């Protein structure tokens, strides 16, 4: 079915609220068939019967003969239609299906996402193993305790079984008990289970990637204090500081610059357009052929220049370097860029591949002489994730009045590590040229993977020149300037994400 509004979707991440319950919606009429399940495959028993040997690890887990399947299409349809009702969805806090590993896998995956514990309580059944590990059609939902009875009644009214099976806990431990019995059948730390759950990926990662990074990521799973992503802003998220200038009806021209292999120009143009600019698509071939002149004046004058992300020339000449060399080694084009960068009324932004390109152009940019080159990530892999960054105090016109804020941002690069010594990084910090830095869950600057996805010293993720008109960064603010673009965000964020402020700051700069 089409997703008509991404704001109405649910994820398996539990709401960190202990006054809630997890409900199992069973679409199999309690059959609990376990043949062909992940559990049966783990024990290499793909045809479990009721006559298992006493020594068999799956003895007593036979359930009903057969494999999980949809037997009642009408029930599945009724479930789908009920889940689409707006009033029900507004009561749901989290959702996960049980078809990949069974109920236990679904429950602990929800706990992993929220870094919480669980108190699992199963009903009196013939086989607890079959109940917890069958992969029959079904789902788990999280709801507030005061709405449990009404929601159960709604599902039962259409012939679907629905029951409470777990409660979240701030104590990071997963326990299993039987309804009406105080005896605990199983208990384990959330961290232990999550490391076991991740162990196969960890072993592959150690062999494929930098093993030190694999170790750091694996050990981080055991940190019970890590509550994941967060956001704290030093500015009013909902204030449109560019509104007075947009209302004048004038739209300054900004060149959205791209080259063969660049792929982020559309999002970038949308962000600048939303901030009140006239975003002009400019391909390097147009500059090289003379169709576009960055030195133009009058109505054709550009007040902004933005180099977008992607993989110019497939990075085969070094990330961003082939793009930069087409400028550096072309006397006329080089002169245009020099004139543009030296004009005090202009600004420039380089993101991802554009950051790498502009770092290579540093000889043309006043006050950027100390910028580093960007090289392969410490992990030795392409990194695509949502990372946490903190805005530094710097002269960057893009980050004006944002210093001290920390919030998530998209990273997507293979060569994002700032190649400079610790002393050189400290020198940049002393000159207030570090604009953004990666931080951990304590909002402390970090070199640890994956919080620092590329290994840049001092967590460097963005830089500015000495007068702040030119800013470069490896993360992608244009991919998260709207709240709905974020895969995680605080509930109170409305239409605009915090990175929209960056583009509005540019509009205020040119007035």
Which ranges hold each PLM region?
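Intein/HINT protein-splicing elements and their conserved insertion hotspots or analogous self-processing inserts
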Residues: 3-133, 147-253, 261
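N-terminal beta1-alpha1 cap of cysteine-dependent amidohydrolase-like domains
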Residues: 65, 180-351, 355-367, 375-383, ...
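Hydrophobic anchor at the start of a short beta-strand
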Residues: 118, 162, 279-280, 470
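Short cationic amphipathic helices and targeting signals
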Residues: 135-144
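Proline-centered loop/turn at the N-terminus of a beta-strand
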Residues: 161, 345-347, 469
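Amide-donor transfer/coupling interface in amidating biosynthetic enzymes
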Residues: 165, 292-294, 338-339, 371-511
